[in-house]
């Protein structure tokens, strides 16, 4: 997996290593006449002389040698298992001495993205390890890392290894946005990368990651291309995946995409189904299905196997809508849903109401408490499926209530503070008055004692 930068330490001059690698390729090929050594020998001779004279190597000659070596390197995948990694490491070392290594790395990545016949059990692990070495020998800002990462993800998809994908996920989570920015990927390249990750995630059984990156890929489609066949296919894939995914209940990222909006004209039944799952209930869904059976929504009949899952999801969403409406009511039945109301809305027996409520709670759509004694569901919290003008008005109303409550609290605090100040001032004034009175009482007797002395002195 991609990790901190790696340096390959391989001793030998370019001509020596190139000749050694050509001989190894010939040993794998077992050719009858023309060999790689024969082809590169005339090119290596002047390079060898330049190395001996310690002069600047002819870069064009070196690139010509590398072209022949890389072209013949397709045979490396047939090498014995223990020799594959050292052989590719040598090739990577040679390619790094090219005037433009990127022109060779993409071809090497394509070789590694193919199966390794000599190691059917560990071939994918070997390819990922070698590709990771290539990735980590490149500078973090080198856009060639994009092609290497694509190859790594392709190998994981082909192997279907959940362990390999799980090992890559932390790097993708932490680095993918930065990589996209650093490599300056355009919309098409970003879309290729997200779709490759989505395919690998799906092959590894990680449906959440697959759905996330399909939506990310969808968001890279510019408005001008929203009606193109490729955009239509991606929008249908994203929408089908979201509708059938057991944990996806928020369709806002999809409805905001231009390519999905374009389905309104190209795939009207599918878009209508999206609108039902976005804001409507089981009643609207059943009316829609009666007019447009599931198998007729898409030309390839992709939704037919998921008919039961679709009905389950719309029931959960219907209950979420009921709960959200209950939170806005007032009176004795505020925030309360009777079993009878729920059973009627979901078209299920009352005996199954608790099961559906529990499933909706598990889905994170509502929170509350079931009362078997009173046959009701007390709603504590509910998810709004659509947050529009009505919901903003409700938020404004609640904020006004909280504001008035806070103003009342502030008024009480202000009154208490003023009362405390008044009482403190009164207490201080009373204490001062008591002090003055005490001073007068203490001063009177002393003056009376001094009076006879003053009279005697006067006499």
Swiss-Prot record:
Q: Which top-level group of life is the source organism from?
A: Eukaryota
Q: Which GO terms describe its biological process?
A: cellular response to farnesol; cytoplasmic translational initiation; formation of cytoplasmic translation initiation complex
User: What does the annotation say about its assembly with partners?
Assistant: Component of the eukaryotic translation initiation factor 3 (eIF-3) complex.
User: What lineage is on file?
Assistant: Eukaryota, Fungi, Dikarya, Ascomycota, Pezizomycotina
Cite the InterPro entries for this sequence.
COPS7/eIF3m, eIF3m, eIF3m_C_helix, PCI_dom
| Segments forming domain PCI | 207-384
Keyword field: Cytoplasm, Initiation factor, Protein biosynthesis
Renumbered residue ranges of the record's region Disordered: 431-459
Q: What is its main location?
A: cytoplasm
What is the protein name for this chain? Eukaryotic translation initiation factor 3 subunit M
- Ranges annotated as biased composition (Basic and acidic residues): 434-452
| Entry function | Component of the eukaryotic translation initiation factor 3 (eIF-3) complex, which is involved in protein synthesis of a specialized repertoire of mRNAs and, together with other initiation factors, stimulates binding of mRNA and methionyl-tRNAi to the 40S ribosome. The eIF-3 complex specifically targets and initiates translation of a subset of mRNAs involved in cell proliferation.
The family note in this entry says: Belongs to the eIF-3 subunit M family.
What are the GO MF terms of this UniProt record? translation initiation factor activity
Q: Where in the cell is it found?
A: Cytoplasm
- GO cellular component assignments: eukaryotic 43S preinitiation complex; eukaryotic 48S preinitiation complex; eukaryotic translation initiation factor 3 complex; eukaryotic translation initiation factor 3 complex, eIF3m
């Amino acid at each position: 997996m991609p990790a901190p930068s790696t340096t390959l330490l391989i001793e030998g001059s370019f001509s020596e290593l190139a000749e050694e690698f050509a001989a190894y390729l010939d040993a794998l090929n077992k050719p009858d006449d023309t060999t790689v050594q024969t082809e590169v020998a005339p090119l290596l001779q002047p390079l060898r002389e330049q190395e001996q004279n310690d002069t600047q190597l002819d870069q064009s000659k070196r690139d010509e040698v590398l072209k022949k070596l890389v072209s013949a390197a397709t045979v490396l995948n047939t090498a014995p298992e223990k020799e594959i990694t050292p052989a590719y490491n040598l090739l990577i070392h040679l390619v790094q001495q090219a005037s433009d290594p990127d022109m060779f790395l993409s071809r090497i990545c394509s070789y590694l993205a193919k199966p390794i016949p000599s190691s059917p059990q560990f071939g994918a692990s070997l390819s990922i390890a070698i590709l990771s070495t290539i990735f980590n020998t490149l500078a973090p800002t080198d856009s060639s890392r994009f092609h290497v990462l694509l190859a790594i993800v392709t190998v994981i998809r082909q192997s279907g290894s959940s362990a390999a994908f799980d090992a890559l996920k932390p790097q993708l989570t932490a680095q993918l946005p930065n990589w996209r920015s650093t490599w300056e990927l355009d919309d098409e390249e970003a879309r290729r990368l997200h779709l490759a990750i989505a395919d690998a995630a799906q092959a590894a059984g990680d449906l959440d990651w697959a759905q996330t990156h399909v939506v990310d890929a969808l968001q890279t489609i510019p408005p001008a291309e929203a009606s193109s066949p490729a955009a239509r296919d991606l929008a249908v894939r994203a929408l089908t995946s979201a509708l059938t995914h057991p944990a996806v209940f928020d369709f806002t990222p999809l409805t905001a995409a231009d390519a999905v909006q374009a389905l309104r004209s190209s795939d009207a039944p599918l878009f209508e189904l999206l609108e039902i799952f976005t804001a409507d209930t089981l009643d609207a869904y059943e009316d829609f299905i009666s007019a447009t059976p599931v198998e007729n929504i898409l030309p390839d009949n992709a939704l037919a196997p998921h008919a039961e899952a679709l009905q389950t999801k719309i029931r959960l969403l219907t209950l979420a809508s009921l709960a959200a409406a209950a939170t806005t009511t007032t009176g004795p039945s505020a925030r309360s849903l009777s079993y009878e109301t729920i059973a009627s809305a979901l078209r299920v027996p009352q005996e199954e109401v608790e099961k559906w409520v529990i499933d909706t709670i598990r889905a994170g759509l509502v929170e509350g408490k079931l009362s078997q004694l009173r046959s009701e569901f007390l709603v504590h919290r509910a998810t709004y499926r659509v947050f529009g003008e009505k919901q903003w008005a409700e938020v404004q109303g609640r904020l006004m209530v909280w504001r008035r409550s806070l103003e009342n609290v502030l008024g009480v605090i202000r009154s208490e503070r003023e009362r405390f100040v008044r009482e403190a001032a009164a207490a201080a004034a009373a204490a001062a008055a008591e002090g003055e009175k005490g001073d007068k009482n203490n001063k009177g007797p002393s003056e009376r004692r001094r009076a006879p002395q003053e009279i005697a002195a006067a006499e």
